[in-house]
Amino acid sequence: MEFHLNIFTLNCWGIPVVSKNRTERYEAIAKYLQESSHTIVCLQEVWSEKDYLYLKDSLKSNLPYSHYFYSGVLGSGLCIFSKWIMQDVFFHQWPLNGYIHKIHHGDWFGGKGVGLCRIKYGNRLINVYCTHLHAEYHEDDIYLAHRMLQAYSTAEFVNLTTGPADISILAGDLNAGPGDLSFKIVTQLPPLVDPFAEDPTKPKPFGTCDCANNSYSDPNQVKICPEGKRIDHILYKLNPAWEAEVIKFGNPLPDRVPGKDFSYSDHNAVSLELLVKPLDNKYVEKEVNIGDTFDDTATQAIKVCGEAMTNLSKSKTLYLTVGGLILMFLIGTVGYWPNSIIYDVIKLFITGLCFYYLIMGSLWHRIEMNSLKAGLTALENFCRTRIESKIATD
């Protein structure tokens, strides 16, 4: 029997104290979801447990099942709401999550990853994945390797867990557009369908971040690209026994919260309505082959890993050199410091700086290097297996 799915995803921008109009926006989001026909909701950046509990209580009548993925220091910020029962839940935390000393970015403290809720609807199983990849922040993008390996880890996780499901949905803020390496990895490896390419009625252009219609968008970014960047996505993968028709796809929210002069979030929402139905004729189950295009994508990913490891080795040398020089200075000036509180504070600061450089060049370097090696060897193993398989079939 055919069935409908109506999925909704939104990066809520829910940083306590920092995010503007947070309380009013959560109230508006809850009101919209109460009145909507969405059956599955994936939210990101719900950083406060209090906000999650508010949403949970507000949506208990139409979306009675929910799960928040606790992780890291602040929590992952990810939660899923469902009309139907959640049979299983699991969270996979990524080994690379930014840098602890980049406090103003905060990704490391969130302990980000990908959450899975396996939803049971009658005798059907629906895998719902919710995720939020590392942000870019700057054009030089020092987090490219982190985000790329997060994408690969997510793609492999989806690829290895979709088996029992009739349909699998990946929703969230990927911080990557259709042409980006991370997006290619996520869509080509499992593989996943981008409904934007399937919906003939879709509006063009269609952005979800830094859009002219969003009150929180950076005016400088809007001038460069008024339609914004499409970095929030809903992607899906079907069991071979099923097919799906895209009924509706786009941003379901108005530009402003009704009666207010601000938007629901600094990102636009995305919704997808699917009609899922069994294939009319008997199907021959076959293995879904990963296209040759992913070979090029994997090669690019390996190159990014290699460059990141080279840069990391250079950083190690810099950190240890600076840390060593500071340590020599501290040892060499023992007994020469005046007995004063001010100088004691200065010594304490310099000592802390010394420890920072030495730890970054030793412990943190090993953690990041091993994470990069893990991703690199996995990608190399994938490419090697693909080559050997092609040789065997020729």
Where are these regions (language model features)?
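N-terminal signal-anchor transmembrane helix
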Residues: 1-9, 17, 22-26, 30-31, ...
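Structured beta-strand-rich core segments of catalytic domains in phosphoester-bond hydrolases
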Residues: 2-4, 12, 21-22, 34, ...
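Active-site beta-strand/loop signature of hydrolases that rely on acidic residues for catalysis
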Residues: 6-12, 25, 29-55, 81, ...
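Glycine-rich phosphate-binding "P-loop"
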Residues: 10-20, 139-147
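Short histidine/acidic/glycine/proline-rich micro-motifs that form metal-
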Residues: 14-16, 72, 176
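Short coil/turn segments at secondary-structure boundaries
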Residues: 20-22, 93-94, 141-143, 182-184, ...
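Glycine-rich, phosphate-binding/catalytic loops in enzymes
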Residues: 25-26, 57-61, 97-98, 145-146, ...
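Metal-dependent phosphoester-hydrolase catalytic domains
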Residues: 159-169, 175-394
